[in-house]
Amino acid sequence: MELLVLVWRQYRWPFISVMALSLASAALGIGLIAFINQRLIETADTSLLVLPEFLGLLLLLMAVTLGSQLALTTLGHHFVYRLRSEFIKRILDTHVERIEQLGSASLLAGLTSDVRNITIAFVRLPELVQGIILTIGSAAYLWMLSGKMLLVTAIWMAITIWGGFVLVARVYKHMATLRETEDKLYTDFQTVLEGRKELTLNRERAEYVFNNLYIPDAQEYRHHIIRADTFHLSAVNWSNIMMLGAIGLVFWMANSLGWADTNVAATYSLTLLFLRTPLLSAVGALPTLLTAQVAFNKLNKFALAPFKAEFPRPQAFPNWQTLELRNVTFAYQDNAFSVGPINLTIKRGELLFLIGGNGSGKSTLAMLLTGLYQPQSGEILLDGKPVSGEQPEDYRKLFSAVFTDVWLFDQLLGPEGKPANPQLVEKWLAQLKMAHKLELSNGRIVNLKLSKGQKKRVALLLALAEERDIILLDEWAADQDPHFRREFYQVLLPLMQEMGKTIFAISHDDHYFIHADRLLEMRNGQLSELTGEERDAASRDAVARTA
């Protein structure tokens, strides 16, 4: 099993130590049975020391068994911690394009459901290991008592285990399907939570989402979980009843066939009773391990970036003068839409506005410009030199951005991840009219319950605090009131230029196009620059041009 192989590779010596403890626990368990057989059944030892010896063995068995199980459980939790941390780091290192293809619902399912299933498996793993080791050790002890009886008992037990595995295989099959259904349910949950306002307004749509999206997926989940539980419980009960049958078989072989005396039969029965709980626990634990393997395979199918422990420090381009996109093209995976070839040269300190209709490719161009999407052909050049695709972090370090689907972080960070310049923060808090709204504590924003427009202002503050050369603003002013929108174009953008910022703003505010150094337009994935009469016409009626 690939999951256990990975544990072995990463924690070889701790794993060996845990196995040694498990072997010691099994040996003590068998030794206790031998002690009962030799000192309490066969010879009926009347010495007063027999009880303290027996109690001492019990306490030692308890301590070693508990120690081995705790050690294995702790090892499992260390592995899960490492697995989750590596998964998060791989998400952070994976191209945005790939993350968008996967979708947040499936990734959240991986971080919650899949990792939880792996955790449960490692909690139950001690039961599986203990059951296997005790079974092997007990078989060796029973062989010494009666080889013929062990052979028949082993055949009986083999049938028991085979039947259990057949049933468990069906559990595995349904668990694999169940995991796919969970992804659908997470998408349904996201629809209900993210679309709560629209669904509250439109009860017919809410009914459709509930009856046509959620209910079929929930019913499919219910079907497979019931089937999985049915086969799991069948496996446990099959094993339970067959173990009791083995005890009857032992006494039949001893008394009817005369293969052993009553003391040996009693020892056999005692050993089987001792094995009953660990063996049944092992059978019960096996589905969790199989489910964990399904979850582990699901995590691997995400095809995220390889794990790298370090966060490479990007190298800055402090004195760049021109940024050029030369014959850059990009097409989405389904080939439903493409942009390019794009040819664009940006000079340091320029203020550029990009206009275009919905679906014209504005946001895609923004993703290409910032290095979040990789061009499928063409190249990006800084001062005439191609930007290496092997180190996109160096290029991305030029940019701060405020996207339309803004996410607010509560920590203000400056260059190189250090605390933000307090004078800069104070200045822009005042400029953004947020000084009375935001509560800061040690560079952390305490209150983030803000309106959408206010969140955009905080996002701009976060971007400016990073003190990077180029700032991308994707329809930033769309959520501002008319007064502050005018303030943004007439006051804030010139202030940013005075700071040396190069500004690339996606905008539909035709009244303010006059403030741009250059006006660009995206139309059906093609970029053009508007000059002269075209620019004047766009300024008079941007809506008509971008419809």
Swiss-Prot record:
Domain ABC transmembrane type-1, residue spans: 15-291
GO cellular component: ATP-binding cassette (ABC) transporter complex; membrane
Annotated ABC transporter domain residues: 323-547
One Pfam entry name: ABC_tran
Chain positions recorded as ATP binding sites: 356-363
CDD domains reported for this sequence: ABCC_MRP_Like
InterPro entries hit by this protein: AAA+_ATPase, ABC1_TM_dom, ABC1_TM_sf, ABC_transporter-like_ATP-bd, ABC_transporter-like_CS, Cyc_pep_transpt_SyrD/YojI, P-loop_NTPase, Type_1_exporter
GO terms (BP aspect): microcin transport; peptide transport; response to antibiotic
Gene3D superfamilies to which the protein is assigned, alphabetical: ABC transporter type 1, transmembrane domain, P-loop containing nucleotide triphosphate hydrolases
Keywords tagged on the record: Antibiotic resistance, ATP-binding, Cell inner membrane, Cell membrane, Membrane, Nucleotide-binding, Transmembrane, Transmembrane helix, Transport
Effect of deleting the gene: Disruption increases sensitivity of cells to microcin J25.
Listed NCBIfam families: cyc_pep_trnsptr (TIGR01194), PRK10522.1 (NF007813)
Function: Mediates resistance to the antibacterial peptide microcin J25, when expressed from a multicopy vector. Functions as an efflux pump for microcin J25, with the help of the outer membrane channel TolC.
Name of the protein in question: ABC transporter ATP-binding/permease protein YojI
This protein's encoding gene: yojI
